[in-house]
């Protein structure tokens, strides 16, 4: 082998070895904190009286099936609402400069710093029995409207912590749009709505898919907010908690956890296949 080819191959092997070495800590962490616990969870889920039937019970047992469906529907509605609200806000904030803009962005993204229990408590202060909405409606309508502990209150809590995740993604995507494409569309006679429909929204498609998948997966597994608000709502995280603590049915809790993880992972994998890019995990 010629000397220059030998050196080139050596450098390539050296880079490959360094890359593998650099990935070793990540592989260790992923194995220790994800792969092994997930394998253990699958085994525990099949170790109860029902055996592997515990996984089938998620779909065929009425209570578990209803919980799964309601959780998926709630997560889907939250995703759609968050995309709609955050897209409008993200487009406006990225394309306009005005006094107080930085403060407004900070306020809109501030919920990322809150744990789910705090979000739930804020919904109680807003729409609980002694909340702001209840006081206003009592004075204006003579009847106190309370919905903090209903599916509407849970939806509001999920929406509150979901919007920031979409806004940040949309703003970053809008910043990368090519203004020349919009100018070309306007030159050809396209109106504002046509420009958004034919140019802007298609260009933002990967951002919609990525942020939507993150919101959906996060809403599927949100526990803190559900624990605070869902006293009479059987969303899947609460059913898992109930099976584990009150019923001491550890096998069923493990099986439900695996089912929840599969649905969340499938949404992220599907989004990745659609967008052709990376879908980051939400914190």
Name each region found by the language model.
Residues 3, 273-283:
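Short, charged juxtamembrane terminal tails flanking transmembrane helices
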Residues 14-48, 60-175, 199, 203-223, ...:
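Membrane-water interface segments at the C-terminal ends of transmembrane alpha-helices
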Residues 188-190, 202:
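Glycine/proline-centered hinge or cleavage motifs at structural transition points of membrane proteins
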Residues 177-181, 279:
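Short glycine/proline-centered loop/turn elements that form peptide/ligand docking sites
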Residues 99, 190-192:
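Short coil/turn motifs that cap or connect alpha-helices
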Residues 185:
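The alpha-helix within a helix-turn-helix
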Residues 47-48, 125, 223-248:
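Glycine-rich helix-loop "coupling/hinge" segments at transmembrane-helix boundaries
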Residues 1-16:
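Short, Lys/Arg-rich, polar N-terminal cytosolic tail immediately upstream
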């Amino acid at each position: 082998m010629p000397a220059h080819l030998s050196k080139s191959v050596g450098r390539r092997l050296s880079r490959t070895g360094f890359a593998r070495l650099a990935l070793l800590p990540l592989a260790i962490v992923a194995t220790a904190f994800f792969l092994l616990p997930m394998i253990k969870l699958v085994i525990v889920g099949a170790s109860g009286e029902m055996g592997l039937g515990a996984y089938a019970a998620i779909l065929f047992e009425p209570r578990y099936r209803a919980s799964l469906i309601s959780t998926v529907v709630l997560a889907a509605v939250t995703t759609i609402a968050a995309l709609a609200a955050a897209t409008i806000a993200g487009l406006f904030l990225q394309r306009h400069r005005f006094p107080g803009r930085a403060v407004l962005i900070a306020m809109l993204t501030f919920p990322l710093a809150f744990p789910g229990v705090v979000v739930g408590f804020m919904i109680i202060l807003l729409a609980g029995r002694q909340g702001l909405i209840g006081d206003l409606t009592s004075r204006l309508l003579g009847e106190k409207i309370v919905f903090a502990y209903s599916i509407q209150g849970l939806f509001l809590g999920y929406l509150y912590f979901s919007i920031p995740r979409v806004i940040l993604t949309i703003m970053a995507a809008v910043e990368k749009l090519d203004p020349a494409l919009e100018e070309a569309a306007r030159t050809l006679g396209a109106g504002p709505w046509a420009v958004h429909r034919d140019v802007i929204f298609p260009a933002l498609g990967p951002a919609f898919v990525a942020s939507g998948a993150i919101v959906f997966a996060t809403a599927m597994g949100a526990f803190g907010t559900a624990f605070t608000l869902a006293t009479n709502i059987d969303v899947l995280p609460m059913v898992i908690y109930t099976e584990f603590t009150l019923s001491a049915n550890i096998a069923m809790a493990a099986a439900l956890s695996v089912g929840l993880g599969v649905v969340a992972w499938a949404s992220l994998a599907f989004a990745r296949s659609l967008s052709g890019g990376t879908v980051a995990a939400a914190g």
